[in-house]
């Protein structure tokens, strides 16, 4: 029997390859007559390491090159960390599948001399590394006495910088640490009361051509309904605010019975203004819950905060 061949476009970073190999293994496990290959490549976000992500100002920093491969027929699907995938996709492409989500929380990772501290007890002036404006804004709001410094590079590079003494601690996604085998380095899971996570954090998104019914059917075996409902609500919230992956917008979602609850926040980069609200609705209509939450935050001034941020980076 001739096997159906499927090619995956992936970033070549260690974490991206771990995630893509998991997708490959799961697809081949569920569909025995499927032969999956991987084309790994560097994206713009992987290449530009000397500039803060937000200053590059592109919503497709980690996805455009993968999408281009699909659009010209060189790849059938692309595997993304869902938090990196823009909410508005190129014509002809769709988010075909959302996998079962890992813990979406942020995690505190410390060097040896700071193991006695939690985030709340770090001494004034402690150097905290993060490349995320979302984390930066929320932590500045809660802990203005700490010193925040941009950190770039993959997870392993960031941990090496931490251990060399360049930082007292760094903030990373708990899911990425777990997937790379660094779960033991999670010193503290940061509570939602301190830092709401990124939209889609902890889940993988599989993108493909909108009209490729055969591929859509194949990848549907990895779809997790609960994770999908939560992430669709979160992505709708982000889309309605016209925010990208690099702006200070955070969320948390939960499902109970037939309802989905969504908490969201928008903050200024300096941490001096932070607005938060929540929305609850029917689990059948997750995107409506996201839209309602965005509307609430707009009434509280979210548009003004975000426009100031966009203007700030436009001038640089």
Swiss-Prot record:
GO terms for biological process: chlorophyll biosynthetic process; protoporphyrinogen IX biosynthetic process. The keyword Magnesium does not apply. Binds 1 dipyrromethane group covalently. It catalyses: 4 porphobilinogen + H2O = hydroxymethylbilane + 4 NH4(+). Its cofactor is dipyrromethane. The keyword Transferase applies. Pfam families: Porphobil_deam, Porphobil_deamC. It is an enzyme of class 2 (transferase). Keywords: Chlorophyll biosynthesis, Porphyrin biosynthesis, Transferase. The modification S-(dipyrrolylmethanemethyl)cysteine is found at residue 245. Disulfide bonds: none annotated. Pathway: Porphyrin-containing compound metabolism; protoporphyrin-IX biosynthesis; coproporphyrinogen-III from 5-aminolevulinate: step 2/4; Porphyrin-containing compound metabolism; chlorophyll biosynthesis. InterPro entries: HemC, Porphobilin_deaminase_cofac_BS, Porphobilin_deaminase_N, Porphobilinogen_deaminase_C, Porphobilinogen_deaminase_C_sf. HAMAP family: Porphobil_deam (MF_00260). Tetrapolymerization of the monopyrrole PBG into the hydroxymethylbilane pre-uroporphyrinogen in several discrete steps. This is Porphobilinogen deaminase.
